[in-house]
């Protein structure tokens, strides 16, 4: 196509939402009219599936659960009065609690207001709040936010080291739907110990966000924590940003959560429309399907041209990959579906991997995120060249990259926001939640469970149980053992490599095992109890 034909294609396929001022452009995806027509029956079913989901159908058949994140920003759509009331109550409780913290009505244990916020969580309990904090937190928030989102001891030390003199002014939120997920539990144990060592009552600083009746809820109530907020059974971690999981940290930072919810609700209305060309999420799902031939053959590279949106690609990694990366479809057929997602930000990436995108392996499509407003209103932009600002350069480099990629046969989508504010970010979250759901219907997979994650947890538990047995055996041993001898003694010669990893880690951390010999020759290493 020449430039005028491309312009006409752009105009023909451009989506614009006048209330949100958001554009979606799929014109640089090379699809044809026959491909679109072939997908219409699939979309008719996808729209019907989505309507049933919102009405309360069991949309997660593997776990027998409803899927209700859309109700969070439109409680009136909830299938029962009880769910509707629970949603409304949770939002009001979040707002009331945040206001009390800001005013000092709930003070820190040593007196004065809380100034720091430490969020302990994993997966969606961290990625959503991190993205929203980076995008929307004011320059001088009422509480400065920090995260523990792993079970890395050095990571704990670094975060707690930064907060060492401020633990007395730090509010700690622990988020875990089940209440027993190892990573947040481990973080909670270590943070609680830090408070005990500092002589500060942890319960006067602690808040839980968890499922009703969970171990975490029981602990919080028994120990008299400040508050417990719910995670509803019908909300998954990766779609929990508009639940207390995301709303509470946002509200405590002074972010307008009502605007966030309103933006999501408005986008939900737009993406509820059962009309392919007039539904922005359907347009995204169609583009993903065609560019990857319905099999995820192309990676999604996310390039937001805005520093505030730096973490959007990490947020989308979980939303897209955990939802769509499935081995079997709804009929039990082995399909190995998924779309790989990665990215950072423009223009940084133009000086990193865009070289490969332009000239190397064509195994991707790009999603550009454009923001029209350069900076906050009232802040002038100086000229860096005659009649050119830094923001003009940002815009020019986005356009230039989009053009250079297309000219070399590389496809792209562009999503344009008017500005980065709570309303736009809420809409962006809702847009991609719906696109993922529609795409999942197109390829007939369950987007709302994560059996692969559970498999990893089970394997980790088996490793830790083997470690306990190993330590007992080594401590009882007189003299030394080789790895094969240890494996034979434990009755698991087939797990010798796992044993090697365990003893190497224990030795490196002074944990009761002494390993001697040449590290390059694992079979010849000598294993014995660490001297007292």
From Swiss-Prot:
Keywords: Cytoplasm, Gluconeogenesis, Glycolysis, Isomerase. PROSITE patterns: P_GLUCOSE_ISOMERASE_2 (PS00174), P_GLUCOSE_ISOMERASE_3 (PS51463). Belongs to the GPI family. SUPFAM superfamilies: SIS domain (SSF53697). Pathway: Carbohydrate biosynthesis; gluconeogenesis; Carbohydrate degradation; glycolysis; D-glyceraldehyde 3-phosphate and glycerone phosphate from D-glucose: step 2/4. It catalyses: alpha-D-glucose 6-phosphate = beta-D-fructose 6-phosphate. Catalyzes the reversible isomerization of glucose-6-phosphate to fructose-6-phosphate. Its EC number is 5.3.1.9. One of its GO terms (biological process) is gluconeogenesis. HAMAP family: G6P_isomerase (MF_00473). CDD domains: SIS_PGI_1, SIS_PGI_2. Pfam families: PGI (PF00342). The active site is at 322 (proton donor), 351, 457. GO terms for cellular component: cytosol. GO terms for molecular function: carbohydrate derivative binding; glucose-6-phosphate isomerase activity; monosaccharide binding. It is found in: Cytoplasm. This is Glucose-6-phosphate isomerase. InterPro entries: G6P_Isomerase, Phosphoglucose_isomerase_CS, SIS_dom_sf, SIS_PGI_1, SIS_PGI_2.
């Amino acid at each position: 196509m020449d430039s005028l034909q491309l312009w006409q294609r752009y105009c023909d396929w451009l989506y614009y939402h006048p209330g949100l001022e958001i554009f979606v452009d799929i014109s640089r995806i090379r699809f044809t009219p026959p491909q679109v027509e072939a997908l219409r029956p699939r979309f008719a079913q996808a729209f019907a599936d989505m309507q049933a989901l919102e009405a309360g159908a069991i949309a997660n058949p593997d776990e027998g659960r409803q899927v209700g994140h859309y109700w969070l920003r439109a409680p009136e759509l909830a299938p029962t009065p009880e769910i509707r009331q629970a949603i409304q109550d949770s939002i009001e409780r979040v707002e009331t609690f945040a206001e009390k913290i800001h005013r000092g009505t709930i003070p820190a244990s040593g007196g004065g207001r809380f100034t720091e916020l430490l969020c302990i969580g994993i997966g969606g309990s961290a990625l959503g709040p991190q993205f929203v904090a980076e995008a929307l937190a004011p320059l001088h928030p009422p509480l400065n936010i920090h995260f523990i989102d792993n079970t890395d001891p050095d990571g704990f030390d670094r975060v707690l080291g930064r907060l060492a003199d401020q633990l007395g002014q730090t509010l700690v939120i622990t988020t875990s739907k089940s209440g027993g997920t190892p990573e947040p539990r481990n973080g909670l144990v270590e943070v609680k110990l830090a408070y005990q060592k500092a002589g500060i009552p942890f319960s006067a600083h602690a808040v839980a966000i968890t499922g009703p009746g969970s171990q975490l809820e029981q602990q919080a109530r028994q120990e008299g924590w400040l508050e417990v907020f719910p995670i509803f059974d019908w909300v998954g971690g990766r779609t929990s940003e508009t639940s207390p999981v995301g709303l509470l940290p946002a509200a405590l930072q002074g972010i307008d959560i009502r605007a966030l919810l309103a933006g999501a609700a408005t986008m939900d209305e737009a993406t509820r429309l059962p009309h392919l060309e007039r539904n922005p999420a359907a347009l995204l799902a169609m583009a993903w399907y065609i560019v990857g031939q319905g099999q995820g053959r192309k990676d999604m590279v996310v390039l937001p041209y805005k520093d505030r949106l730096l973490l959007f690609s990490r947020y989308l990694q979980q939303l897209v990959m955990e939802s769509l990366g499935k081995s079997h479809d709804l009929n039990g057929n082995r399909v190995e579906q998924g779309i790989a997602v990665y990215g950072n930000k423009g223009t940084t990436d133009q000086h990193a991997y865009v070289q490969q995108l332009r000239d190397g392996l064509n195994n991707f499509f790009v999603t550009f995120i454009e923001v029209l407003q350069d900076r906050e209103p009232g802040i002038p932009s100086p000229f860096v060249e005659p009649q050119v600002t830094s923001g003009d350069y940002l815009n020019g480099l986005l356009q230039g990259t989009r053009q250079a990629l297309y000219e070399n046969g590389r496809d792209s989508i562009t999503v344009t926001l008017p500005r980065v504010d709570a309303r736009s970010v809420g809409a962006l979250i809702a847009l991609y939640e719906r696109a993922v759901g529609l795409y999942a219907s197109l390829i007939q997979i369950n987007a709302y469970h994560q059996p692969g994650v559970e498999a990893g947890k089970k394997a980790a538990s088996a490793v830790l149980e083997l470690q306990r047995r190993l330590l007992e055996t080594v401590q009882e041993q007189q003299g030394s053992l080789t790895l094969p001898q240890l494996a034979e003694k434990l009755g698991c010669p087939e797990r010798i490599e796992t044993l090697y990893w365990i003893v190497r880690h224990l030795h490196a951390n002074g944990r009761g095992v002494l390993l001697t010999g040449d590290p390059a020759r694992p079979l010849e290493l000598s294993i014995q109890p660490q001297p007292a």
